[in-house]
Every structure is written in structure tokens, then in C-alpha cells.
Amino acid sequence: MVLPQHVTVGQLAGVHGMGVGFLSAGIGDVPADQTYLDVGQGARVTESLYDGSLPRLRVTSGHGGTAKVPPPEWGAVRQRADSVPADIVPGLLGTTLEQAHVAVGAGSSAGSAALMLIDEHGALGGAGCHGACPIVSVESANLAAVRRLAGHSHGDDLLIAIERPPPASNRALALGIAGSGFDGTLTSDSTRMRGFVLSTDLGPTILTRLGIPKPSDMTGEPIRPDGAVDVSYIQDLQSRLAEVGPRRAPVIGISVLIWVVLTAIAAIAFRHEGLRVALTILAASLALLPAALLLGAALEPSELGERLIVGVGCPVLAALVLWLAPGMRGLAVCAGATVLAYAVDVIAGSHLTELSLIGPNPIEGVRFYGIGNELEATVAALVPIGTGAALAGWAPRASGRAAAVAFAITAVLAVAAFAPGSFGADVGAAIGIPIGAAVSIGICLGVRRTGWVWVIVAPLAAVAALIAIDLATGGNAHLTRSVLDAGGLGNLGDIFQRRLQLSAHSFARYAESFIFWIVIALIVTGLTQWRRIEGWFGGRRTAWAGFVGALAATLAGTLANDSGALLLMIGAVLCAATVGVAWATHEERRSPTFWSPPVR
């Protein structure tokens, strides 16, 4: 049943026996017809992967009264789907139902909503049903009709009611399901988030109810209830998810901009000594920023409150940390606090990571649990930076072998927390973090030429271990679900091509940003001043190893991730901040302060 727009979860919860939640209508803002097609094909990708936009579709009555999409229009839909480096099959749900001898139909008021049940040939109910057989139908209705149908349902009847798409920007659709076993707050393994499911989960839900196996090309998962209906919780969840994207610029971007301006003012007002102090506080604040965002997710304050937590709280706490643990030690403490906070959260499964402003932004429709691209870039850089800074601050005389062991241990622990599907669910963490650690270890041990083969071996071993862990623990991560369970390693080519296209798109998008070109200027400056930067680290070889490892992890993430430009900017900023600390503390023998303790 497709209900009028603006129907609420609270209204659906008033229907007897109906479980409720919110439905992600697509990846980003998509037209209604795309949402309906996604339901029918059981898979969805970002609009940028398609060759062209979706044409306007009509569902008309054909010969014998059979509803269908005109062949030219359906041909355009199939051709558009074939252009995507993924297994997208428009009409898959309708064809699967027909092959199982299920009667498929649509009411006269269904309109384009019938696209959800159109088969692969663009027709509705093309296969006949002989004798008694199940029926799956779609139609438009109002809330009163839903109440009436829910009251008359019995046995294995299933009534699915969704708000008519598209939803308002940065919002989701209200969803209700009535039937035996669905009275509760809805969820699915696609999101692992109570109260939030995907459009691609509807098809598997219908098929599971009918006892029909889900086709391998469907990526959605069956919807199920999780606890009693909790309208207040669902509404609060929707509100918080809707705030994540819009708040990123004012809370994160403006705060960092203010910090940079204050750093420049300190340099002008207090010259060399002021810049030393300001750069160290800036780096520590940047390292603490993600941890402050996790606190914001827990407290769910107003936008002003979150800006104060980040914009004021981070520098104040950074200054306190640096007073207690000056120089590289303070940077290590701040980096460790952020990495540890998110590791504990994803392992505990509290979902604060998903609700934080640096989390995966579930309402965007791409990732719904674990860490997103922003956190992947942050963690991949902070792990080697923090490890190197800790060694330089607390164990400056550690042997190369001991330092290498430390880098290896922190990398293994970080991958164990952020890569498996049961925790951080980010395969990129199994690539970037091991590469960063391998480079740091190589510098600590002074390896030459063939010794750098471990830079290649480390991520391969980590990904292999990740697959084994997910299969053993039932992590059901994207890697195992889409590659091993749905066609084997042959799908890796499609995934690689898809990531390259999305990464190229991200560079094209960020190329219009002034911040992007500032970061590029920082990178170019760093390359031209490489020897001078190395000199600022001086005898602190472990800090230098951590810095270079962070650069390697950032480069690996940029090449392997579908948001390459974003990872490049985040990693480059954190690496530049580390250089700032190295410069600020490299003269500590001549000018000791409480920011940089004198060498004994």
C-alpha cells in the first residue's frame, strides 16, 4: 500500500498489529520512480554510476488488460541498468514471484508504484496462476483503508504500507508492516539499526514470507521486528539522522576554520613562541575532534550546543592535555583517545558512531553501521601518528625492533576493531591501516628495496583474515555478502570499477571547493620541502615513521576508496598538523617551555 505523503510513523503505529520504522528511499535524493525500481530490483547504487538520468516512466494497460511499461521506456531502463558496474536487474522481484507461480497485480490507483512489481520484461503479472496461489498486489490507499485491511488480515497475510516517495530532502519515508510476527520496531541486517530499513529490503521481506529463496542479485535483507513499537525513539532517531549532514559544515568546518584563524592571530601577536603553542594546540584539537563528535552523538544537543562542544571544548581540553603531557606526548594522548573511543563504541555496538557527525551518515543511503569514509581516513592516519608520537614522547630510546613491534600491535588492534563486519565493518581499514603500519615498520627497521614487499603483503593478509573472521563470526559485512555470497571473486572487478568511478566523481565534486585546493597546496609544499620537514622531526625517528606511515595510509585510502578526494583531504590535514607539532617542538633544547619539556 502506498500512502499519501506526510503520513507519520505515529499514525501508522496506531494501526492494530502494525510494526513501524523509517525507510531509506534511495542513495541521496532520488525520484519516486527510482525508489520503486530499487524495490523491484532489490539493489541500488548512487545515481552518478548510471549513464544518464532516469527517464519518465508510465505504466499503461496493454493487450488483454495487462499493465506494462512501454517497450521503448523499459528498454531505456534496462540499458541504463546495464551501464552500472554492478548486478542491477530491473523487475527482478516481479519475475521471481511469477516464476514461483505467485499472482502479481496492481490496483487502478497504483500508478507508477506498480514499478515495484513489474517483471524483467516490463510487464505486470505476465505469468499465469493456476488454481489457488498467493497474491502480491500494490495499490494506493489512505490510512483508513490500511486500518481496514489490517483488521481483516489473518494467517500469513502481510500488509506493507509506505509513505509515497520522494521524501523531503535528507529525510526517510514512514513505513508500517502488519502481519504475524511484525508487531514491533522494524529493522534489518542491511542497516543493523533499530527503526531504519532500506527500500531494497522490501523484496526479500515479501519473498521470505512466501518461502521463496532470495535471488543472489538482491542485496537487501528481510525486515524483522526488534523490540516493541517505540514511536518516540523512532522519531528521535529520524531527527538525529537528518541533522548529521547539515551540521557537518557549521560544527566541523567552521570550528576548524576558527582554530586556523586563531593560530594565525597567535603567530602575528606572539610571533615564534605564539605559533609554537598555537600549532601544538591546533594539532591536538584536530586529533580530539572526532572524540568530541562522539560525545555530541551521545548527548544529542542543539546545533549551538554541538558547536560549543567541538569549537570550544576541543581546544580547552587539548590545552589541558598538553599542559599535563607536553609536545608529542599530548598529541599521542589525543590521537589515542579518539581511536580508543570509537573502537570501544563499534565493539560495544552502541550505534553512537552512526549518529556522530563524522559517522557514515545513514540518511544518505550508502552506509548504515560501522565507520564511514571520514572515520576511515581519520583512524588510518591517527593510528600511526599516535603510535609514533607515543614512542617519541615516552620511549625515545626504543630500539628499531621494539618500535616496529609497537606499530604492528597498534595496527593489528585497530584492524580488529574497525574492519570486521561485526564491529567497524570497514574493509578499507584492512587496507589503509596495514599499509601505514608496514611503512612505519620499514622505516624503524631501516629496510631496503625487497624489504618493502611487506607494504603489499600486509593489506592482502589483513583482507584475507577479515574474510575468514566474517565467515566464522557471521559478520555479514559488505565484502563477504556481495563478493563471496553473490557470485564469488568475479564480482571484485565490478567493485573495483565502481570504486574508481565514484572516486573520480568525488575529485570532480571537490575540485570546486577552495578547501580542496588549499590541501593540494599543502601537499605540494610538503613534497618540495621533504628534507626540511624530516629535519624538524630530528632524532625522533619513531615520530617520523608514524608521520610517513600516515601519509602511506592516506594514499592507500585515496586510491582504494570510493571517496578518494575526501580521504585525501582528511589524511593530509592530520599529517600537516603533525608536521606543525614537529616544527613547534624541534627547538626544545634551546627554548624549553611547558609545551615541550627539556631533554634530559
Question: What do these predicted regions represent?
Answer:
Residues 235-363, 372-396:
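Core alpha-helical transmembrane segments of integral membrane proteins
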Residues 332-360, 365, 454-456, 460-490:
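Aromatic-rich transmembrane-lumenal/periplasmic boundary elements in polytopic membrane proteins
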Residues 269-271, 394-398, 448-450, 528-536, ...:
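Membrane-interface capping segments at transmembrane-helix boundaries
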Residues 410-413, 428-466, 575-577:
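Hydrophobic alpha-helical segments of polytopic membrane proteins
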Residues 227-229, 272-288, 326-338, 399-408, ...:
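Membrane-interfacial loop-to-transmembrane alpha-helix junctions, especially the N-terminal start
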Residues 291-308, 414-434, 530-575:
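Membrane-water interface signatures at transmembrane helix termini and the short loops
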Residues 241-252, 360-382, 422, 484-515:
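Short aromatic-rich membrane-water interface segments that cap or initiate transmembrane helices
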Residues 1-246:
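Soluble extramembrane regions of membrane proteins in the secretory/endomembrane system
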